[in-house]
Amino acid sequence: VSSILTKEEATFAIPYFGITPKGNFEDHSHPNPLPGLNVLHIADPERKLSGPEQSLLATVKTKLYDAQRKRIRPHLDDKVLTSWNGLLLGSLARAGVIMDEPAWLDAARKNFTFVTTKLWDPATKTLYHRWRDGERDTTQLLTAYANYLHGSLELYQATLDPAILTFAIDLADGMIAKFYDEKASGFFSSMGGADLLFRAKDDYDGAEPSGNSTAVYALLKLAALTEKATYRTKAEATLKLYATRVTELPQALPLMLQAAAFADEEPFRAVIAGDPALPETKLLIRAAHSVYQPHRVILGTTGPVEPFALTLLPREGKATAYVCTGNSCRPPTSDPAEIQQSLRPKGKPSP
Protein backbone atom coordinates (compact mmCIF):
# COMPACT_ATOMS: atom_id res chain seq x y z
CA VAL A 1 0.00 0.00 0.00
CA SER A 2 2.81 2.38 0.90
CA SER A 3 4.43 1.78 -2.50
CA ILE A 4 1.21 2.71 -4.32
CA LEU A 5 0.10 5.72 -2.30
CA THR A 6 1.74 8.97 -1.28
CA LYS A 7 2.89 9.32 2.34
CA GLU A 8 -0.21 11.36 3.23
CA GLU A 9 -2.52 8.87 1.53
CA ALA A 10 -0.85 5.87 3.17
CA THR A 11 -0.95 7.51 6.62
CA PHE A 12 -4.71 7.82 6.20
CA ALA A 13 -5.42 4.50 4.44
CA ILE A 14 -3.44 2.07 6.64
CA PRO A 15 -5.42 2.63 9.86
CA TYR A 16 -8.66 3.30 7.98
CA PHE A 17 -8.55 -0.13 6.32
CA GLY A 18 -7.20 -1.92 9.41
CA ILE A 19 -3.86 -2.86 7.84
CA THR A 20 -1.18 -4.16 10.23
CA PRO A 21 2.45 -5.33 9.68
CA LYS A 22 1.66 -8.88 10.82
CA GLY A 23 -1.60 -9.01 8.88
CA ASN A 24 -5.23 -8.87 9.96
CA PHE A 25 -6.36 -12.13 8.34
CA GLU A 26 -6.17 -15.37 10.31
CA ASP A 27 -6.66 -18.56 8.33
CA HIS A 28 -7.79 -21.07 10.95
CA SER A 29 -8.42 -23.71 8.29
CA HIS A 30 -4.72 -24.05 7.36
CA PRO A 31 -2.05 -25.55 9.66
CA ASN A 32 0.58 -23.15 8.30
CA PRO A 33 -1.25 -20.01 7.19
CA LEU A 34 0.61 -17.42 5.18
CA PRO A 35 1.77 -14.52 7.39
CA GLY A 36 1.30 -10.84 6.72
CA LEU A 37 -2.01 -11.07 4.86
CA ASN A 38 -4.36 -8.11 5.13
CA VAL A 39 -7.99 -7.89 4.09
CA LEU A 40 -8.93 -4.27 3.49
CA HIS A 41 -12.02 -3.32 5.48
CA ILE A 42 -13.38 -0.27 7.25
CA ALA A 43 -11.84 -0.72 10.68
CA ASP A 44 -14.15 1.78 12.39
CA PRO A 45 -17.58 1.93 10.70
CA GLU A 46 -18.69 4.65 13.15
CA ARG A 47 -15.95 7.05 12.10
CA LYS A 48 -17.21 10.21 10.40
CA LEU A 49 -14.97 11.51 7.64
CA SER A 50 -14.43 15.20 7.03
CA GLY A 51 -14.73 16.67 3.56
CA PRO A 52 -10.97 16.52 2.88
CA GLU A 53 -10.83 12.96 4.22
CA GLN A 54 -13.63 11.88 1.88
CA SER A 55 -11.70 13.31 -1.07
CA LEU A 56 -8.56 11.55 0.15
CA LEU A 57 -10.45 8.26 0.45
CA ALA A 58 -11.74 8.56 -3.11
CA THR A 59 -8.19 9.05 -4.39
CA VAL A 60 -6.90 6.11 -2.34
CA LYS A 61 -9.61 3.78 -3.62
CA THR A 62 -8.96 4.77 -7.23
CA LYS A 63 -5.21 4.15 -6.93
CA LEU A 64 -5.65 0.80 -5.15
CA TYR A 65 -8.22 -0.33 -7.70
CA ASP A 66 -5.97 0.62 -10.62
CA ALA A 67 -3.14 -1.37 -9.02
CA GLN A 68 -5.41 -4.35 -8.45
CA ARG A 69 -6.48 -4.39 -12.10
CA LYS A 70 -2.88 -5.07 -13.13
CA ARG A 71 -2.86 -8.37 -11.25
CA ILE A 72 -4.04 -11.66 -12.74
CA ARG A 73 -7.72 -11.94 -11.95
CA PRO A 74 -8.91 -15.03 -10.04
CA HIS A 75 -11.39 -17.33 -11.73
CA LEU A 76 -14.94 -16.02 -11.64
CA ASP A 77 -17.68 -18.25 -10.24
CA ASP A 78 -20.74 -16.84 -11.99
CA LYS A 79 -22.97 -19.88 -12.18
CA VAL A 80 -26.59 -19.59 -11.08
CA LEU A 81 -27.75 -22.14 -8.47
CA THR A 82 -31.47 -22.67 -8.12
CA SER A 83 -31.30 -23.73 -4.48
CA TRP A 84 -29.54 -20.55 -3.34
CA ASN A 85 -31.77 -18.41 -5.53
CA GLY A 86 -34.79 -19.95 -3.84
CA LEU A 87 -33.56 -18.76 -0.46
CA LEU A 88 -32.81 -15.31 -1.87
CA LEU A 89 -36.20 -15.16 -3.58
CA GLY A 90 -37.99 -15.78 -0.30
CA SER A 91 -35.91 -13.20 1.55
CA LEU A 92 -36.37 -10.50 -1.09
CA ALA A 93 -40.11 -11.08 -1.33
CA ARG A 94 -40.78 -11.08 2.39
CA ALA A 95 -38.46 -8.19 3.21
CA GLY A 96 -39.75 -6.20 0.24
CA VAL A 97 -43.38 -6.29 1.35
CA ILE A 98 -42.65 -5.80 5.06
CA MET A 99 -40.22 -2.91 4.53
CA ASP A 100 -42.24 -1.46 1.64
CA GLU A 101 -39.28 -1.65 -0.74
CA PRO A 102 -40.61 -2.01 -4.31
CA ALA A 103 -37.07 -2.47 -5.65
CA TRP A 104 -36.67 -5.64 -3.58
CA LEU A 105 -39.97 -7.03 -4.84
CA ASP A 106 -38.94 -6.16 -8.40
CA ALA A 107 -35.69 -8.07 -7.87
CA ALA A 108 -37.67 -11.03 -6.54
CA ARG A 109 -39.90 -11.01 -9.62
CA LYS A 110 -36.86 -10.88 -11.90
CA ASN A 111 -35.38 -13.83 -10.02
CA PHE A 112 -38.63 -15.75 -10.47
CA THR A 113 -38.88 -14.91 -14.17
CA PHE A 114 -35.29 -15.95 -14.83
CA VAL A 115 -35.51 -19.30 -13.04
CA THR A 116 -38.91 -20.25 -14.45
CA THR A 117 -37.72 -19.31 -17.94
CA LYS A 118 -34.20 -20.76 -17.93
CA LEU A 119 -34.28 -23.59 -15.40
CA TRP A 120 -37.84 -24.92 -15.40
CA ASP A 121 -39.40 -27.44 -17.79
CA PRO A 122 -43.18 -27.24 -17.29
CA ALA A 123 -43.88 -30.27 -19.49
CA THR A 124 -42.00 -32.64 -17.17
CA LYS A 125 -42.18 -30.48 -14.01
CA THR A 126 -38.40 -30.54 -13.86
CA LEU A 127 -36.35 -27.86 -12.12
CA TYR A 128 -32.67 -27.81 -13.04
CA HIS A 129 -30.08 -26.88 -10.45
CA ARG A 130 -27.38 -24.93 -12.29
CA TRP A 131 -27.24 -22.44 -15.17
CA ARG A 132 -24.27 -20.75 -16.78
CA ASP A 133 -23.69 -19.19 -20.20
CA GLY A 134 -27.02 -20.41 -21.50
CA GLU A 135 -26.50 -24.01 -20.42
CA ARG A 136 -28.13 -25.92 -17.57
CA ASP A 137 -27.01 -29.17 -16.01
CA THR A 138 -29.09 -32.30 -15.55
CA THR A 139 -28.50 -32.64 -11.80
CA GLN A 140 -31.68 -33.14 -9.81
CA LEU A 141 -31.44 -32.08 -6.15
CA LEU A 142 -34.14 -31.88 -3.51
CA THR A 143 -32.77 -28.60 -2.17
CA ALA A 144 -33.34 -26.93 -5.55
CA TYR A 145 -37.02 -27.90 -5.54
CA ALA A 146 -37.64 -27.33 -1.82
CA ASN A 147 -35.84 -23.98 -1.58
CA TYR A 148 -37.46 -22.63 -4.71
CA LEU A 149 -40.87 -23.82 -3.55
CA HIS A 150 -40.29 -21.90 -0.32
CA GLY A 151 -39.23 -18.79 -2.24
CA SER A 152 -42.17 -19.00 -4.64
CA LEU A 153 -44.67 -19.22 -1.79
CA GLU A 154 -43.13 -16.15 -0.15
CA LEU A 155 -43.38 -14.27 -3.46
CA TYR A 156 -46.99 -15.36 -3.91
CA GLN A 157 -47.94 -14.18 -0.44
CA ALA A 158 -46.24 -10.84 -1.11
CA THR A 159 -47.93 -10.27 -4.49
CA LEU A 160 -51.00 -12.57 -4.60
CA ASP A 161 -50.17 -13.30 -8.24
CA PRO A 162 -52.13 -16.50 -9.04
CA ALA A 163 -49.62 -17.51 -11.73
CA ILE A 164 -46.96 -17.84 -9.03
CA LEU A 165 -49.18 -20.11 -6.94
CA THR A 166 -49.92 -22.22 -10.01
CA PHE A 167 -46.19 -22.64 -10.56
CA ALA A 168 -45.69 -23.54 -6.89
CA ILE A 169 -48.27 -26.32 -7.19
CA ASP A 170 -46.57 -27.74 -10.28
CA LEU A 171 -43.18 -27.50 -8.58
CA ALA A 172 -44.47 -29.28 -5.47
CA ASP A 173 -45.96 -32.04 -7.62
CA GLY A 174 -42.65 -32.45 -9.44
CA MET A 175 -40.75 -32.54 -6.15
CA ILE A 176 -43.02 -35.23 -4.72
CA ALA A 177 -42.87 -37.33 -7.89
CA LYS A 178 -39.07 -37.21 -8.09
CA PHE A 179 -37.93 -37.34 -4.47
CA TYR A 180 -40.66 -38.58 -2.12
CA ASP A 181 -40.23 -42.07 -0.68
CA GLU A 182 -43.66 -43.65 -0.98
CA LYS A 183 -42.61 -46.66 1.09
CA ALA A 184 -40.93 -45.09 4.12
CA SER A 185 -41.90 -41.40 3.67
CA GLY A 186 -39.44 -38.52 3.64
CA PHE A 187 -37.59 -37.07 0.68
CA PHE A 188 -34.43 -38.39 -0.94
CA SER A 189 -31.69 -35.81 -1.46
CA SER A 190 -31.24 -36.61 -5.14
CA MET A 191 -32.67 -38.60 -8.01
CA GLY A 192 -31.67 -42.21 -8.40
CA GLY A 193 -29.31 -43.33 -11.15
CA ALA A 194 -27.17 -46.21 -12.36
CA ASP A 195 -24.06 -44.72 -10.71
CA LEU A 196 -25.76 -44.14 -7.34
CA LEU A 197 -25.46 -47.01 -4.86
CA PHE A 198 -28.17 -45.73 -2.53
CA ARG A 199 -30.31 -42.63 -2.10
CA ALA A 200 -29.77 -40.73 1.13
CA LYS A 201 -32.10 -38.43 3.07
CA ASP A 202 -30.58 -35.36 4.70
CA ASP A 203 -31.25 -34.80 8.39
CA TYR A 204 -29.32 -31.67 9.37
CA ASP A 205 -30.12 -27.97 9.08
CA GLY A 206 -26.79 -26.22 8.69
CA ALA A 207 -25.89 -22.96 6.97
CA GLU A 208 -28.45 -24.08 4.39
CA PRO A 209 -31.58 -25.78 5.75
CA SER A 210 -31.98 -29.44 4.86
CA GLY A 211 -34.15 -30.30 1.90
CA ASN A 212 -36.54 -32.31 4.06
CA SER A 213 -37.09 -29.49 6.56
CA THR A 214 -37.70 -26.95 3.81
CA ALA A 215 -39.94 -29.32 1.85
CA VAL A 216 -42.09 -30.13 4.88
CA TYR A 217 -42.58 -26.49 5.86
CA ALA A 218 -43.34 -25.41 2.30
CA LEU A 219 -45.83 -28.24 1.74
CA LEU A 220 -47.67 -27.40 4.96
CA LYS A 221 -48.04 -23.79 3.80
CA LEU A 222 -49.09 -24.87 0.33
CA ALA A 223 -51.73 -27.15 1.85
CA ALA A 224 -53.09 -24.23 3.87
CA LEU A 225 -53.20 -22.03 0.76
CA THR A 226 -54.84 -24.58 -1.53
CA GLU A 227 -56.56 -27.08 0.80
CA LYS A 228 -54.95 -29.92 -1.16
CA ALA A 229 -54.74 -32.74 1.39
CA THR A 230 -51.92 -34.62 -0.35
CA TYR A 231 -49.40 -31.91 0.55
CA ARG A 232 -50.22 -32.04 4.25
CA THR A 233 -50.26 -35.85 4.19
CA LYS A 234 -46.75 -36.02 2.74
CA ALA A 235 -45.49 -33.36 5.16
CA GLU A 236 -46.94 -35.05 8.24
CA ALA A 237 -45.54 -38.42 7.21
CA THR A 238 -42.10 -36.86 6.87
CA LEU A 239 -42.42 -35.24 10.30
CA LYS A 240 -43.16 -38.66 11.77
CA LEU A 241 -40.12 -40.13 10.01
CA TYR A 242 -37.87 -37.54 11.67
CA ALA A 243 -39.62 -37.59 15.07
CA THR A 244 -36.90 -39.64 16.78
CA ARG A 245 -34.11 -37.53 15.30
CA VAL A 246 -35.81 -34.30 16.38
CA THR A 247 -36.51 -35.64 19.87
CA GLU A 248 -32.97 -36.87 20.47
CA LEU A 249 -31.14 -33.97 18.81
CA PRO A 250 -33.52 -31.03 18.30
CA GLN A 251 -30.72 -28.58 17.55
CA ALA A 252 -29.92 -30.56 14.39
CA LEU A 253 -33.23 -29.68 12.73
CA PRO A 254 -34.47 -26.26 13.89
CA LEU A 255 -36.45 -25.63 10.70
CA MET A 256 -38.11 -29.04 11.03
CA LEU A 257 -39.15 -28.02 14.56
CA GLN A 258 -40.62 -24.81 13.16
CA ALA A 259 -42.53 -26.84 10.59
CA ALA A 260 -43.81 -29.17 13.32
CA ALA A 261 -45.07 -26.17 15.29
CA PHE A 262 -46.85 -24.88 12.19
CA ALA A 263 -48.49 -28.27 11.68
CA ASP A 264 -49.60 -28.47 15.30
CA GLU A 265 -52.34 -25.85 15.10
CA GLU A 266 -54.73 -24.41 12.54
CA PRO A 267 -53.01 -21.47 10.82
CA PHE A 268 -54.59 -18.09 10.28
CA ARG A 269 -55.59 -17.46 6.68
CA ALA A 270 -55.49 -13.79 5.78
CA VAL A 271 -57.58 -13.63 2.62
CA ILE A 272 -57.22 -10.35 0.72
CA ALA A 273 -60.04 -9.63 -1.74
CA GLY A 274 -59.14 -6.95 -4.24
CA ASP A 275 -56.84 -6.15 -7.14
CA PRO A 276 -53.27 -6.81 -5.87
CA ALA A 277 -51.97 -4.07 -8.17
CA LEU A 278 -53.97 -1.33 -6.42
CA PRO A 279 -52.37 0.68 -3.59
CA GLU A 280 -55.27 0.01 -1.19
CA THR A 281 -54.86 -3.75 -1.65
CA LYS A 282 -51.11 -3.53 -1.18
CA LEU A 283 -51.70 -1.78 2.16
CA LEU A 284 -53.75 -4.73 3.38
CA ILE A 285 -51.17 -7.23 2.14
CA ARG A 286 -48.42 -5.33 3.92
CA ALA A 287 -50.48 -5.13 7.11
CA ALA A 288 -50.93 -8.90 7.10
CA HIS A 289 -47.17 -9.34 6.74
CA SER A 290 -46.18 -6.71 9.30
CA VAL A 291 -47.23 -8.71 12.37
CA TYR A 292 -45.02 -11.55 13.56
CA GLN A 293 -47.39 -14.47 13.27
CA PRO A 294 -45.67 -17.74 12.32
CA HIS A 295 -49.01 -19.59 12.09
CA ARG A 296 -50.32 -17.63 9.13
CA VAL A 297 -50.66 -17.72 5.36
CA ILE A 298 -51.76 -14.88 3.09
CA LEU A 299 -53.78 -15.52 -0.05
CA GLY A 300 -55.93 -13.86 -2.65
CA THR A 301 -59.32 -14.78 -4.06
CA THR A 302 -58.33 -15.87 -7.56
CA GLY A 303 -56.33 -18.76 -8.96
CA PRO A 304 -55.83 -22.18 -7.36
CA VAL A 305 -56.49 -21.06 -3.76
CA GLU A 306 -58.60 -23.00 -1.26
CA PRO A 307 -62.31 -23.08 -2.28
CA PHE A 308 -63.66 -20.89 0.52
CA ALA A 309 -61.38 -17.99 -0.44
CA LEU A 310 -62.86 -18.00 -3.93
CA THR A 311 -66.23 -16.99 -2.46
CA LEU A 312 -64.94 -13.90 -0.66
CA LEU A 313 -65.42 -10.54 -2.36
CA PRO A 314 -64.45 -6.90 -1.79
CA ARG A 315 -67.04 -4.93 0.19
CA GLU A 316 -68.43 -1.58 -0.90
CA GLY A 317 -65.94 -1.39 -3.74
CA LYS A 318 -62.94 -1.48 -1.39
CA ALA A 319 -60.19 -4.05 -0.96
CA THR A 320 -61.23 -6.23 1.97
CA ALA A 321 -59.41 -8.61 4.28
CA TYR A 322 -60.89 -11.71 5.88
CA VAL A 323 -58.86 -13.27 8.70
CA CYS A 324 -60.02 -16.86 9.08
CA THR A 325 -59.15 -19.97 11.07
CA GLY A 326 -60.79 -23.23 10.17
CA ASN A 327 -64.36 -22.51 9.06
CA SER A 328 -64.76 -19.22 10.95
CA CYS A 329 -63.67 -15.71 9.99
CA ARG A 330 -63.40 -12.39 11.77
CA PRO A 331 -65.62 -9.58 10.46
CA PRO A 332 -64.32 -8.35 7.08
CA THR A 333 -62.30 -5.16 7.23
CA SER A 334 -60.54 -2.63 5.02
CA ASP A 335 -58.57 -1.23 7.97
CA PRO A 336 -54.90 -2.33 8.07
CA ALA A 337 -54.81 -1.85 11.86
CA GLU A 338 -57.67 -4.30 12.34
CA ILE A 339 -55.85 -6.91 10.26
CA GLN A 340 -52.78 -6.51 12.43
CA GLN A 341 -54.83 -6.83 15.60
CA SER A 342 -56.55 -9.99 14.32
CA LEU A 343 -53.23 -11.62 13.49
CA ARG A 344 -51.32 -10.49 16.58
CA PRO A 345 -50.41 -13.45 18.82
CA LYS A 346 -52.54 -13.76 21.94
CA GLY A 347 -51.12 -12.15 25.04
CA LYS A 348 -49.16 -9.55 23.05
CA PRO A 349 -50.94 -6.18 23.22
CA SER A 350 -50.66 -3.60 20.51
CA PRO A 351 -47.49 -1.49 20.90
Positions of the model-derived regions?
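Glycan-recognition and catalytic cores of secretory/periplasmic carbohydrate-active enzymes
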Residues: 2-351
